[in-house]
UniProtKB/Swiss-Prot annotation:
The keyword Nucleotide-binding does not apply. Keywords: Acetylation, Mitochondrion, NADP, One-carbon metabolism, Oxidoreductase, Phosphopantetheine, Phosphoprotein, Transit peptide. The gene is Aldh1l2. The modification N6-acetyllysine is found at residue 903. PROSITE patterns: ALDEHYDE_DEHYDR_CYS (PS00070), ALDEHYDE_DEHYDR_GLU (PS00687), CARRIER (PS50075), GART (PS00373), PHOSPHOPANTETHEINE (PS00012). Residues 1-19 form a transit peptide. It catalyses: (6R)-10-formyltetrahydrofolate + NADP(+) + H2O = (6S)-5,6,7,8-tetrahydrofolate + CO2 + NADPH + H(+). NADP(+) binds at residues 592-594, 618-621, 651-656, 671-672, 694-695, 778, 825-827. Residues 339-416 form the Carrier domain. Its EC number is 1.5.1.6. This is Mitochondrial 10-formyltetrahydrofolate dehydrogenase.
Length: 923
């Protein structure tokens, strides 16, 4: 085989080109899929000797033809291969001239004669988008969804004289998600994996390893092609059947019904998993029950009483509208264009004219699709407008919803003016009458400024730890949801208003958000109490109060982030100036724990936003609700779409995807050390993203005999029992000097007996429930281990006998350095006390530092010299002297050793979300 020099150079480092067998291929087909298969086959070193595709349409070549022509590959564009049942001689001769060893048909709409199919040495292989023998025929993907199949996939098979009946070479499958459409299934799996499989199949043939597995007749089905005339909805079926029919026809040919005498097509169907919202009835011919036009879309009902939601409607003239606007679709007034807007309209008219090259004049009545445009042209139109109109962001659906030029210009102008933004954010709430108020709780993913269901419709229950009941079901973010959220954050940073906003205006938004949080502090604190078990009075002061303070503090930093000038050696006789700039990183990910759901959000996101970044935040799976309420407030504060995205779900799915995502430039994490290590590894392997980790702790608190004992008892209890012990800096081990040890323990037990354990919404409650059942069970096991190892259980150690996840405040003494209790964090209301000899300062310091953790620490003594000596020697990110838990928004917070690195709070936190650029100029 002869290779051009450029080919050899291009593949020099890719040994697979030289050490694998390669074939001469004829590619027969069309479309972007065909183009990608063609390109990948070339990269693998195969030689495409000819491309056989469809003729140009309206002067535009198919993507496969364009790619091949650009490479100099022979391209043949035949309108047909046969005439009156016989192969056209000229076509056959042209095909034979290329000398192919294998025909590859990635996507082909033409009938290819069998003499062509069988002509090459290795025959022909075809891609088919179903798991053959199921769904033979041209509408295979549609029928996969229409029939409610749980598995979808594709087959690469050897062509024979039957209809999709040839032997199987390979197959790949995937799960069908509840709300998959033809497009989502194709884009997620059939397109990308299909390309890989076609290339793999060709290589298997080249290596002589390709199987030929006969198709079984058992389970074989053949369905006809779906066209508009046979896509009408049949209403006598369950909601799931209606949903499958609609999504199986989305976008082509489109499932439809007759409404008010005209054909209306449904798009964007999803099954309703919550209660049916209120709306205005809409009669639909043939439907047993009227639909409901709601603020979220059109609700349709199956014969089983269950419901589905349709997002968009399309009328006979091609115009598409949000289904929620059905009764107001014709009420929009025409806007008068300014001189500047007229210039934009002329620019867009030129773009339309280029795309619709066969349309002599573009007029207001010119319809984009009726003038010959296809779905590919929609993408081109959106991209050309973005490039030519100052980065104006349109969506593909904007074109479908305004197909005539005049309507399209009106939509563009409204977008430029901000008039097409929703007047009121659409939020589905779960409402609770609790704590003397009506609490409204969002429960969906918050992506790109909208509350939306998870793409696959999955939800999970979030539980009230006070009584173990379900508060509501929350959207469970999938990988696709994470990707959408990251894309929104990336776009908002690179192309949106946020990236162009003045720093002072950014600060103004953050101040406004802090004010809204303060105005809604009672509701936020109530949600925090319901979802995390936080005592309401503590939630008001700390969980919510410090969150408000954090946003105000960092709002003030927005316009004070600055670089410096640096004197360097001059390039004499010229001069140099060197300065640094601090710049945001881009789209950041934040993963927070469950102990302070809103405060942990604030600690990280406020600094991230002040630095100018955008973010995707994953709250803890068990405590997502205050984060979602916070998302609602960000919209009310005026934050642009995509700046803040909240995705509830699991760490194993959503969290892992964020740590691996190539478009995330920084990840801030608070959680366990073991998970932190995995995150750091994923961040390094993916794209070496910047990381800050606030991890586990076993914070020592040393209490000397010369302390203020009353204060030491009070604050020592707070160091352990504050927030039910679910506190990252909780004193994990108390070292009490021998002279006061017994009295200290006695006083602590006396004070514990005064504590009221109960409903966190009761204003007199001191100690609420543990966050969730699994954590409570872990704490009980922790206590059991302590007893088994010989520690003395002085008080508690049991679950409180009442509904919910309540645990008694617990005290252990006699804890030796080798014991499990001395080494491992409980993260609960368990005081672990060890005695140390009188006057043995260095000895107790050695014991206190004998841990891999280094988050916080404390010392109580009246001797300032002793206090300062101890603070110097303690290996921890924070040292408290004669106090504990005294954090402040202006004081940097973070650990060392295996408690992590990086800082929250204070000016230092900003540096976690900034990069420094050095600029040197000569003059």
């Amino acid at each position: 085989m002869l290779w051009r020099g450029s080919q050899a150079l291009r593949h020099f480092s890719t040994s697979r080109v030289y050490f694998k067998n390669k074939l001469k291929l004829a590619l027969i087909g069309q479309s972007l899929f065909g183009q990608e298969v063609y390109s990948q086959l070339l990269k693998e070193g195969h030689r495409v000797v000819g491309v056989f595709t469809v003729p140009d349409k309206d002067g535009k070549a198919d993507p496969l033809a364009l790619a091949a022509e650009k490479d100099g590959t022979p391209v043949f564009k035949f309108p047909r291969w046969r005439l009156k049942g016989k192969t056209i001689k000229e076509v056959a001769e042209a095909y034979q001239s290329v000398g192919a060893e294998l025909n590859v048909l990635p996507f082909c709409t033409q009938f290819i004669p069998m003499d062509v199919i069988d002509s090459p040495k290795h025959g022909s292989i075809i891609y088919h988008p179903s798991l053959l023998p199921r769904h033979r025929g041209a509408s295979a993907i549609n029928w996969t969804l229409i029939m409610g199949d749980k598995k979808a996939g594709f087959s690469v098979f050897w062509a024979d004289d039957g209809l999709d009946t040839g032997p199987i070479l390979l197959q790949r499958s995937c799960d069908v998600k509840p709300n998959d459409t033809v497009d989502s299934l194709y884009n997620r799996f059939l397109f990308p994996e299909g390309i890989k499989a076609m290339v793999e199949a060709v290589q298997l043939i080249a290596d002589g390893k390709a199987p030929r597995t006969p198709q079984p007749e058992e389970g074989a089905t053949y369905e006809g092609i779906q066209k508009k005339e046979n896509a009408e909805v049949s209403w006598d079926q369950p909601a799931e059947g209606l949903h499958n029919w609609i999504r199986g026809h989305d976008k082509v040919p489109g499932a439809w019904a007759e409404i008010n005498g005209q054909m209306v097509t449904f798009y964007g169907s999803s099954l309703l998993t919550s209660s049916v919202p209120s709306g205005e009835p809409l009669d639909i011919r043939g439907a047993k029950k009227p639909g409901l036009v709601t603020k979220n879309g059109l609700v349709l009902f199956g014969n089983d009483g269950k419901a589905l939601m349709v997002r968009n409607l399309q009328f006979e003239d091609g115009k598409m509208i949000p289904a929620s606007q059905y009764f107001s679709a014709g009420e929009t007034s025409v806007v008068e264009l300014t001189a500047e807007e007229l210039k934009v309209a002329e620019t867009i008219k030129v773009i339309w004219a280029r795309i619709l090259s066969n349309t002599p004049v573009i007029e207001d009545s010119t319809d984009f699709f009726k003038s010959g445009a296809s779905s590919m042209d929609v993408v081109r139109l959106v991209e050309e407008i973005r490039q030519s109109c100052g980065g104006l962001q349109l969506q593909n659906e904007d074109v479908y919803m305004a197909t005539k030029f005049g309507d399209f210009i009106q939509k563009v102008v409204r977008r430029l003016r901000g008039e097409d933004e929703e007047a009121e954010m659409v939020v589905d709430y779960v409402s609770k009458e609790v704590n003397g108020m009506t609490v409204k709780i969002p429960y969906q993913c918050f992506i790109n400024g909208q509350f939306v269901d998870a793409e696959d419709g999955e939800t999970y229950a979030t539980v009230n730890p006070t009584d173990g009941t379900t508060i509501c079901r929350v959207s469970y973010a999938s990988l696709a949801d994470v990707d959408r959220a990251v894309a929104a954050a990336k776009d908002a940073f690179e192309n949106g208003e946020w990236g162009r906003m003045n720093a002072r205006d950014r600060g103004r938004l953050m101040y406004r958000l802090a004010d809204l949080m303060e105005e809604n502090q009672e509701e936020l604190a109530t949600i925090e109490a319901l979802d995390s078990g936080a005592v309401y009075t503590l939630a008001l002061k700390t969980h919510i109060g410090m969150s408000v303070q954090t946003f105000r503090y960092f709002a003030g930093w927005c316009d004070k982030i600055q670089g410096s000038t640096i004197p360097i050696n001059q390039a004499r006789p010229n001069y140099n100036l060197t300065f640094t700039k601090k710049e945001p990183l881009g789209a950041c990910a934040i993963i927070i724990p469950w102990n302070y759901p809103l405060m942990m959000l604030a600690w990280k996101s406020a600094a991230c936003l002040a630095a100018g970044n955008t973010l995707v935040l994953k709250p803890a799976q068990v405590t997502p609700l205050t984060a979602l309420k916070f998302a609602e407030l960000t919209v009310k504060a005026g934050f642009p779409k995509g700046v803040i995205n909240i995705i509830p779900g699991s760490g194993g799915v959503a969290g892992q995807r964020l740590s691996q995502h190539p478009d995330i430039r920084k990840l801030g994490f608070t959680g366990s050390t073991s998970v932190g290590k995995q995150i750091m590894k994923s961040c390094a392997v993916s794209n070496l993203k910047k990381v800050s980790l606030e991890l586990g702790g076993k914070s020592p608190l040393i209490i000397f005999s010369d302390c203020d004992l009353e204060k030491a008892v009070r604050m020592g209890m707070g160091a352990v029992f504050f927030n039910k012990g679910e506190n990252c800096i909780a004193a994990g081990r108390l070292f009490v000097e021998e002279a006061i040890h017994d009295e200290f323990v006695t006083r602590v037990v006396e004070e514990i007996k005064k504590m009221k354990i109960g409903d966190p919404l009761d204003r007199s409650t001191d100690h609420g429930p543990q966050n969730h059942r699994a954590h409570l069970e872990k704490l009980l096991q922790y206590c059991e281990t302590g007893v088994q190892e010989g520690a003395t259980l002085v008080y508690g150690g049991r679950q409180v006998q009442r509904p919910g996840f309540f645990m008694e405040p617990t005290v252990f003494t006699g804890v030796e350095d080798h014991m499990y209790l001395a080494k491992e964090e409980s993260f609960g209301p368990i005081m672990v006390i060890s005695k140390f000899q009188n006057g043995d300062i260095d000895g107790v310091l050695q014991r206190a530092n004998n841990t891999e953790y280094g988050l916080a620490s404390g010392v109580f003594t009246r001797d300032i010299n002793k206090a300062m000596y101890v603070s110097d020697k303690l290996e921890a990110g924070t040292v408290f002297i004669n106090t504990y838990n005294k954090t402040d928004v202006a004081a940097p917070f973070g650990g060392m050793k295996q408690s992590g690195f990086g800082k929250d709070l204070g000016e230092e936190a900003l540096n976690e979300y900034l990069k420094i650029k050095t600029v040197t100029l000569e003059y």
